[in-house]
Every structure is written in C-alpha cells, then in structure tokens.
UniProtKB/Swiss-Prot annotation:
Belongs to the amino acid-polyamine-organocation (APC) superfamily. Cationic amino acid transporter (CAT) (TC 2.A.3.3) family. The chain crosses the membrane at residues 37-57, 65-85, 103-123, 162-182, 191-211, 248-268, 289-309, 339-359, 385-405, 409-429, 487-507, 520-540, 552-572, 580-600. It is found in: Cell membrane. The keyword Cell membrane applies. This is Cationic amino acid transporter 2. Pfam families: AA_permease_2 (PF13520), AA_permease_C (PF13906). It comes from Danio rerio. The gene is slc7a2.
Length: 640
C-alpha cells in the first residue's frame, strides 16, 4: 500500500525532460522576429486600460502621484518579467509558465498552471471582445445595444443583458486569422500597435503642451471649497475635503501604494511572448529582449499618459470612464476625442489579439505532452495549431455571446498571479540545481537511465534525510558547486518561504487592525513569520548556484524572485471570497480531466514506463548471463 502511495506521489512530481541538443527543433513555423515579439508584448499589455485606468486611479487613489503608482507597478511587473525572460532563454519552447513549471516542479503543478492560464486567456479574450463591441457601439450612438435589447433581451441570472453577436464575429474572425498563420497575424498586430503608440504619443505631447504644473500642486483650501460647493454647504468650517489634502500626494503615500496595486494589472500581458518559443527566430535572445523592451515601452506610455492627463486638468475633475476626451475638451481641443477613439479601438484590437494568441499555444503544448486531449495538438499545413485555435475561439465566442463577464474578470487575476509566482519560484529552484538534473538528455534507445537520474525532488529530499547529508556545518559552509543536498535545501526553503509569505499577506490583509492595535497574538505570529522568512532567505543565499550561463539571467538572486512572489501572493490574497469559490469550481473540473485522462496519457509517464521496461530487461539478461557463467565455472571445476 505504501509503495503504491509513493508511486502515485512520484507521478505527480515527475518532471519534463528537455533535450538541450534539440531546443531549436520545432514543428511550428519559425517566422517571428524580435520586433514582432516587442509589438506583441506592447500590443497585449498596452490595451484599452491606458485610456481608462489613469483617470480612475488618479481621481480615487493617487492624484498626480499616479506617475509614482505606475513606477511602483512597473517595478513589480519587471520582477516577474525578468523571471520569464530567464526561462525563455533556458527553455525556448511553446508553453510559457506551464512548460517552465513542468521542467522544474513537476507535472501536477504544471497542469494547474496551464489550466489557470487557459481560464485567464479565455475570459480575457471574451471580455476584450465585448469591450471592443461596446466601444464601437458607443461611437455609432448605441444602436447595436438598443436593437439587441429590444429583440434579444435575456433575463437569466449570470447571463448578459443581451447576446453580443458583434463580439462573436470578432473572435471568430480573429480565430480564422490565427489559423491562417502566425506571420500574417504578426503583421496585423504591428499595424494596430503602431497606430496605438502614435495616438498615445499625440496624447502625451498634447498634455505637456497644454498642461499646467499648478494642477500638480492644488492647495487643500481649494479642495475644501470645491467640496463645499459640491455638497451645497453654506460654511466651510469643519469641512473635510473629499479629494484628499492637495499637493502631489493628496491621498498620502498610502493612496499612491493603493493605486500601484491597481496599476499592476495594467502590465499584465507580456507573458504572451513566452508562448512563442517555437515560432521565433533565435528565441534564446529574442524572448528576453522582447519581454524587457515591451515592459519598458509600456511603462513609458502609462507614465506619459498619466502625467499628461493630470497636467491638463485637475485630478478631481477627471472622468473615471473616459478621462482623455473630457481632458481634451477641458483644454479646448474637443475634436481630439476622435483621435482618442481611434486609438482606443486599435488598443482593444491588439489586446484582443494578445489574449487570443497565447491561448491555442498553451492548449497545443499541454496536448502535445499528453496532459490534455491529443487532438488539440493537430497542426495545419502552414504549421499553425489549427485544432487548438478553433477550440479556443469557439469557447471564447460562446462566453462572449452569453455570459456577463464582469463577475468572472477577477478570476483572470488568480491565473496570472499564480503563474507569475510559480515562474519566480521555478527560477529560484532551477538556479540552485546541479546542472545534470536539468540538462540530461532524453534516454537513447537501449540505454539504462533508471536510478539516481530518475529521482524526483521529493525522493532527493528523502535521500538527503536518510543519508544524513545535511548538517549545520554543511548548511553554513556548502560545497562550491550545487549538489542534490544543496538543491534540496533550497527547495525546502522556497516552499517554507512561500508559506510564510501567504501567512504574512493574510495577516496584513485581514488582521491589519490587530497589528496596529499591538495585539500580542498578531505581533507574535508576525515576528515568528519574519524570523522564519529571514532564516530561509539566509539559507538560500548560502547555497551554491549553477555555473551554467545563458543569454539572460535574473539579477539580484534570490531577492528579486522572492520579492516578486511576495507581491503576487499579496495581490492574490486581496481577491474576494466569491472569486476563490469560482476558482475552486474551475480547478475541480481541471482535476477531473487530469486524474481521469492527463495523468495516464502523459508522455513523461510513457517514457518512464519504457525506461523501467528497458532496465528490467537488462537486469534479467545480466542475471541470466551470470547464471550461465556460474554454471559453466561449476562444471569446469567439478571432480566428476
């Protein structure tokens, strides 16, 4: 019974073997350049949020200090981006965070990551398609909405007010474009991205030309007077401003940090670059450059637009839904709103492509590995994942057609933040592993590689304890090169660190008042957590790193990945309970698929069974040869 449980546990953490000699091989068409990747990352990340988010955050959270909010959010996003960039250099294959988890922490975590990325991209595609439809309808006077509400109104809970035929057509059109070929899709994306960037440059330049620096230093007295007028009060005595204390930080630095948490989601989308590993030329160089440059461009755009917006008009007058058209009207440039509308549609188009593009590639990678249904890995004559693309498009179209996606959008955040956290943890684990544990090639025919090379991480932990390989001296004075023992120390420390981060994030979010009130239990839990955290980080720092060099490596290890994990976990804890319930339902469906199909059809399971069969056969042959030799020797020495 125990042996069966151990075998089952090992199967959950079996890792994907990557042949280092075949990293450049691909069944997909390698036709994308570094510029294509930058355009894809910028287009996906710099969506319609740049036209809306700045007004919402500036008015309600940050004021003029929204530029600092975007800077903090950009730094947090860059930490995740650098982790993706290193993995893109190490494993330039299709699959993004799913693949990175598979080669590092095992099959079950890889499936969880991939399954959540599928959810994120499906909801993202559907919601952006509906937003595109709504924006276009608003430009033409709302005729589509009026017509659909009149003839196709739906009154069922959970469903949209009316079916969005326009959004369905958009998704199906995009699916056809992606099925036709990635090269053509990249050209369309570059055109829309270029228009979007040009419009944003126009907005930024206009803002600095027509802006007034006094809008960054509004006095508290002025804000109180405005509050009095708004509330229709006769006297300003004992009246507190509704718009903060004025100045550059009207809501304090706490408001700036709150704005940064919202702005963080504006940088989500760059991870689509990591799914192009088998379709880009020179991926080990292009993927890191694409991720870093696209994040830099997006930060400059968000920083510039938010600065221009808050310079053009006082932050308390900004419109939360469409701030840019109102700002241009405020400075007397009303017709500029049509330029903004064109840019908004282009931004939505690139964002739609950025959500749709990685979805079939995640499906393709999982199906090719056998953890999802095999038919999804079928390729067209143009080397495009046509089956996965059509399945993804159909699913997203149905959701956009029927469902009210507002309640589901928060679920996107769980999938994205979980992927970010896992990739950061995987970078930590991988950098402290012995080279052979990652770089061993696939087993050639007839070669036995069962034994130490087949040990999973959990097995190495058991061996470490059994052999007594870790002492206080070895922890503080480890060898110069990574070993199984030093790798296991890092793995255990990373797991404990993540658990401590979860505890601290939960404590700060739900029991922050207890900490402020200096309650003993809260201070005790916080102090113990911080002590364990410091010990774990210290132990990780003491262990040797691999000397294997790649084209890009995350700097400031282990601090930068750990900080990235903290930011991502903290943001996940902020999500509502309803979101986590919906997430649990989605995961339950995923586990049914994995334990009912994927676990038994995985390529890694087949490879392991083949290796075991070869090893058993060799052992049998060796035993027979020994028996024959022994028998011959006995006959020769027998006195008879």
């Amino acid at each position: 019974m125990l042996e069966h449980c151990l075998t089952f546990g090992r199967s959950l953490v079996r890792r994907k073997n990557v042949d280092q000699g075949c990293l450049e091989e691909s069944k997909l068409c390698r036709c994308l350049s570094t510029v294509d990747l930058i355009a894809l990352g910028v287009g996906s990340t710099l969506g319609a949020g740049v036209y809306v988010l700045a007004g919402e955050v500036a008015k309600g959270s940050s004021g003029p200090s929204i530029v600092v909010s975007f800077l903090i959010a950009a730094l947090a996003s860059v930490m995740a981006g650098l982790c993706y960039a290193e993995f893109g250099a190490r494993v330039p294959k299709t699959g993004s965070a799913y693949l990175y988890s598979y080669v590092t922490v095992g099959e079950l975590w890889a499936f969880i990551t991939g399954w959540n990325l599928i959810l994120s991209y499906v909801i993202g595609t559907s919601s952006v398609a509906r937003a595109w439809s709504g924006t276009f309808d608003e430009i033409i006077g709302g005729h589509i909405e009026k017509f659909c509400k009149m003839y196709f109104k739906m009154s069922l809970p959970g469903l949209a007010e009316y079916p969005d035929f326009f959004a369905v057509c958009l998704i199906l059109l995009l699916s056809g474009l992606l099925s036709f070929g990635v090269k053509e899709s990249a050209w369309v994306n570059k055109i829309f991205t270029a228009v979007n960037v040009l419009v944003l440059m126009f907005v930024i330049i206009s803002g600095f030309v027509k802006g007034d620096s006094l809008n960054w230093n509004i006095s508290e007295e002025s804000l109180v007077n405005i509050t009095v007028v708004k509330r229709n009060i006769s006297s300003a005595a004992n009246v507190t401003s509704d718009y903060g204390a004025g100045g550059f930080f009207p809501y304090g630095f706490g408001g700036t940090l709150a704005g940064a948490a919202t702005c963080f989601y504006a940088f989500v989308g760059f991870d689509c670059i990591a799914t192009t590993g088998e379709e880009v030329k020179n991926p080990q160089r292009a993927i890191p450059i694409g991720i870093v440059v696209s994040l830099l461009v997006c930060f400059l755009a968000y920083f510039g637009v938010s600065a221009a917006l808050t310079l053009m008009m006082p932050y308390y007058l900004l419109d939360e839904k469409s701030p840019l058209p109102l700002a241009f009207e405020y400075v007397g440039w009303g017709p500029a709103k049509y330029v903004v509308a064109a840019g908004s549609l282009c931004a939505l188009s690139t964002s739609l492509l950025g959500s749709m593009f990685p979805l079939p590639r995640i499906l393709f990678a999982m199906a090719r590995d056998g953890v999802l249904f095999r038919f999804l890995s079928k390729l067209s004559k143009r080397q495009s994942p046509v089956a996965a693309t059509m399945a993804a498009g159909t699913t997203a179209a149905i959701m956009a057609f029927l469902f009210d996606l507002k309640a589901l959008v928060d679920m996107m955040s769980i999938g994205t933040l979980l992927a970010y956290s896992l990739v950061a943890a995987c970078v930590l684990i991988l950098r402290y592993q012995p080279d052979a544990s990652f770089e061993r090639s696939r087993i050639s025919e007839g070669k036995e590689e069962v034994g130490e090379s087949e040990l999973t991480e959990s097995e190495s932990h058991l061996n470490m304890l059994k052999d007594g390989g870790v002492t206080l001296r070895s922890l503080l004075h480890p060898p110069l090169l990574p070993t199984e023992n030093t790798s296991s120390v890092v793995n255990v420390s990373v797991i404990i660190t993540v658990l401590v981060v979860c505890v601290v994030s939960t404590l700060n979010t739900y029991y922050g008042q207890a900490i402020i009130a200096m309650e003993l239990w809260a201070l005790g839990v916080l102090a113990a957590s911080l002590f364990i955290f410091i010990i774990c980080v210290f132990l990780i720092c003491r262990q040797p790193q691999t000397r294997k060099k790649v084209s890009f490596m995350v700097p400031l290890l282990p601090f930068l990945p750990i900080l990235s994990i903290f930011v991502n976990v903290y943001l996940m804890v902020q999500l509502s309970g309803d979101t986590w319930i919906r997430f649990s339902i989605w995961m339950a469906i995923g586990f049914l698929i994995y334990f009912g199909y994927g676990m038994w059809h995985s390529d890694e399971r087949k490879r392991h069974l083949q290796n075991c069969a070869v090893a058993t056969e060799k052992k049998t042959l060796t035993g027979n040869e020994g028996f024959v030799e022994n028998k011959t020797h006995t006959e020769k020495t027998s006195p008879c």
